[in-house]
């Protein structure tokens, strides 16, 4: 009887050890599974600490949180130099908003996945050349970009809908965009239109270049360029537009407020939505390769007072936006 009791106690102790071992193995399995799904750290670097930049960041975060779990966000302004360096080292993905923020991140060449958003294509190409030697080297190093330059086809389509008898199209290019003149010329001719293309340098007197084209154009379209070119030409473009009663299709909300008839542009919500979609692709390992992403979405705005001055009747906005952003 005593021997039977000893055997039973020994067997019980063995069973307890096996149960404990099984528990540890199961625990290790779950611990390993949890580690494989560790938190992804996304760092936002903004060029300016303003409401519009914060709005874009918050919208991106909302879109990501609606489909993703285990994502942590941090936000810094580009001028926080020491903090930016440390935050970039700890991040899994860096998202910059604005050319100033992109320059800070690209200049550090951290070897991290980087998405530069809210930036013109010309600004990105200049930074790629400066810090990586070429666009291809920057993309190969992990940089991708969401540019705000709306395709010219969208402005052409809008102009054709607003002006059914459209023929002569005045197009203004600057130093950053003049290389695209042959491509733009072809796009206009393919649409059955007559191009009147002018190129302005920083040393030119804008009115001397713009006036001859404006007076013979049915519509005038300035292509976004450097901040200096955009600012110095806008005043003359709008004054001559008023003088010759030629509608202007601009590239920003501010252009319309200042006196352009209309604009096709990337709104903060447009930028946020497309940027969030790309980030989600990266988080889900569904991002094929780094590239320059043209605007997927667009916003259209009219200045009804300018339309009245030009004697034009503007229809419901849906008439003009139908199929516009798909180009």
Per-range role (PLM):
Residues 4-20:
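Bacterial N-terminal signal peptides that target proteins for export
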Residues 19-29:
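Bacterial N-terminal signal peptides
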Residues 31-35:
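Signal peptide processing junction and immediate N-terminal pro/mature segment
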Residues 36-327:
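Short hydrophobic alpha-helices and adjacent helix-cap/hinge residues
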């Amino acid at each position: 009887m005593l021997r039977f009791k000893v055997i039973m106690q020994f067997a019980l102790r063995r069973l307890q050890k096996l149960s404990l071992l099984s528990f540890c193995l199961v625990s290790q399995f779950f611990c390993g599974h949890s580690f494989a799904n560790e938190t992804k750290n996304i760092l936002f670097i903004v060029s300016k600490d303003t409401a519009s930049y914060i709005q874009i960041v918050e919208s991106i975060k909302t879109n990501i949180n609606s489909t993703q779990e285990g994502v942590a966000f941090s936000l810094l302004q580009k001028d926080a130099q020491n903090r930016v360096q440390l935050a970039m080292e700890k991040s899994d993905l860096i998202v910059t908003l604005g050319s100033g923020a992109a320059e800070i991140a690209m200049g550090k060449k951290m070897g991290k996945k980087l998405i530069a958003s809210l930036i013109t294509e010309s600004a990105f190409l200049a930074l790629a050349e400066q810090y990586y030697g070429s666009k291809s080297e920057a993309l190969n190093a992990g940089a991708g970009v969401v540019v705000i330059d709306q395709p010219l086809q969208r402005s052409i389509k809008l102009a054709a809908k607003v002006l059914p008898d459209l023929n002569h199209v005045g197009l203004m290019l600057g130093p950053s965009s003049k290389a695209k003149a042959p491509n733009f010329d072809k796009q206009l001719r393919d649409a059955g239109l007559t191009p009147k293309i002018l190129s302005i340098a920083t040393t030119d007197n804008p009115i001397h270049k713009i006036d001859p084209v404006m007076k013979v154009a049915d519509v005038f379209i300035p292509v976004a360029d450097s901040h200096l070119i955009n600012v110095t030409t806008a005043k003359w473009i709008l004054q001559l537009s008023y003088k010759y009663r030629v509608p202007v299709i601009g590239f920003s909300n501010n252009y319309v407020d200042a006196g352009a008839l209309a604009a096709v542009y990337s709104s903060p919500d447009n930028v946020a939505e497309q940027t969030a979609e790309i980030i989600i692709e990266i988080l889900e390992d569904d991002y094929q390769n780094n590239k320059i992403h043209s605007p997927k979405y667009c916003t259209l705005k009219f200045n009804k007072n300018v339309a009245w001055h030009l004697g034009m009747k503007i229809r419901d906005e849906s008439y003009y936006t139908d199929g516009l952003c798909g180009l």
